[in-house]
């Protein structure tokens, strides 16, 4: 499938998004477990949906959260979406009180319409993105140059400007 080993080029974390008016008065991650809170998640088979559930499991193991935190939050889920953009759209349209998305999904287009609630690093799930030249690539030299660009400072700066986490320097 690939000509050489793939390389890590960017990473992403999860955040909780809330509608600007925040009528459910969500101030902390623990509030997601309160009865009556309407939450939208990506479906479990979608990467962000899987990562969201892993976050809930990690939180339930912390003393600051109830041991049944995951079950209580999942009981509040009103919709499971096929992709992360649909999660953001439902929260933006005020069809839910909260949703879990990637940090990069809080784009400038929606940033004014949504609030961000951070998930601390010890509870968060790191999504890692890899890049490689495929064996069937018609222009492997050009693809290789593109990969070099993405891994170098200019490419990492562009990714960082769009909310991705920079990867350690390659040698």
Question: What do these predicted regions represent?
Answer:
Residues 1-2, 129:
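N-terminal post-signal-peptidase region of extra-cytosolic proteins
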Residues 7-12, 18-171:
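Exported/periplasmic ABC-transporter solute-binding proteins
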């Amino acid at each position: 499938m690939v000509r050489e080993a793939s390389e890590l080029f960017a990473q992403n974390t999860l955040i909780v998004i809330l509608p600007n008016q925040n009528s459910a008065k969500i101030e902390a991650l623990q509030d997601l477990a309160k009865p009556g809170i309407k939450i939208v998640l990506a479906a479990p088979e979608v990467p962000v949906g899987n990562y969201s559930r892993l976050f809930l499991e990690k939180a339930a193991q912390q003393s600051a959260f109830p041991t049944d935190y995951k079950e209580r939050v999942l009981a509040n889920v009103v919709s499971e979406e096929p992709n992360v953009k649909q999660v953001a759209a439902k929260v933006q349209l005020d069809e839910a009180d909260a949703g879990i998305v990637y940090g990069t999904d809080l784009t400038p287009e929606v940033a004014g319409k949504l609030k961000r609630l951070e998930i601390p690093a010890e509870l968060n799930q790191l999504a890692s993105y890899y890049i490689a030249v495929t064996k069937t690539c018609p222009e492997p030299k050009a693809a290789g140059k593109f990969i070099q660009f993405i891994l170098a400072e200019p490419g990492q700066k562009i990714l960082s400007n769009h909310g991705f986490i920079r990867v350690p320097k390659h040698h």
